[in-house]
Amino acid sequence: MQAIVETVFDAVYLVSVITIGILMICGCKGNHQFKLFGLMAVVLGAGDSFHLIPRALALCTTGLENFTVPLGLGKWITSVTMTVFYVLLYYVWRERYRVKGNNGLTAAIYGLAAVRVILCMMPQNQWLSDGSPLSWGIYRNIPFALMGLLIIVLFYRSAKEHDDSAFRWMWMTIVLSFGFYIPVVLWANTVPMIGMLMIPKTCAYVWTVLIGYSAMKKECK
């Protein structure tokens, strides 16, 4: 039953975010903000597919224990694409609120992204083996969480300052995604049921994408 429910959920998620992303890229009418948002949605879905498709195959066939390498490789790729996702979201913020300058902030985003990617590439992560060390799961997620925190603050402050009703909950979607993700990083290996938090985390990302799509439909008539 878990295999069917999880596979259907993941399939709907991947098709939805990639489709919405393509619709945004094609329907943005030259609006660079929404083109970036569409690209961001495609990166999100395409990146997650490297992990979710092998997981679905594993659940529906011989089990997760027989898909260690494909699942590990998928997580590895997803860790990088999620970093790209937040860099793109930063540029969505700059475009939407017409931010100029702030080179220090841009450097911080790129610096954290670079540290995150470098940490993800370290062999100590043992991506392709069973039982990746918790310590490296924490190390590589520290710069990622700091990126998320910066994006949360930026969208919260800017939406409030500009009375931006369309993006007023963008910051909350990111808070929720990290709120559900962090316990999985810390405790999923010892308490497997905590892994179920990835479902509401995924829903938070769908909310993020829908905020952008809804705004485009209203602003690009």
Question: Where on the chain are the PLM-derived regions?
Answer:
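Internal transmembrane alpha-helix with an interfacial aromatic "cap," most often the third helix
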Residues: 21-28, 50-106, 120, 155, ...
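Non-cytosolic membrane-interface motifs at loop->transmembrane helix junctions
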Residues: 3-6, 64-76, 129-142, 191-201
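Membrane-proximal helix-loop-helix units in multi-pass membrane proteins
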Residues: 80-151
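Terminal transmembrane helical module of multi-pass membrane proteins
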Residues: 171-217
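Membrane-interface helix-boundary motifs at transmembrane edges
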Residues: 26-37, 93-105, 132-133, 157-169, ...
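C-terminal ends of transmembrane alpha-helices
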Residues: 46-61, 114-132, 174-194
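Hydrophobic transmembrane alpha-helical segments in integral membrane proteins
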Residues: 1-19
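Alpha-helical transmembrane segments in multipass membrane proteins, preferentially the mid-helix core
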Residues: 17-27, 87-93, 118-123, 142-168, ...
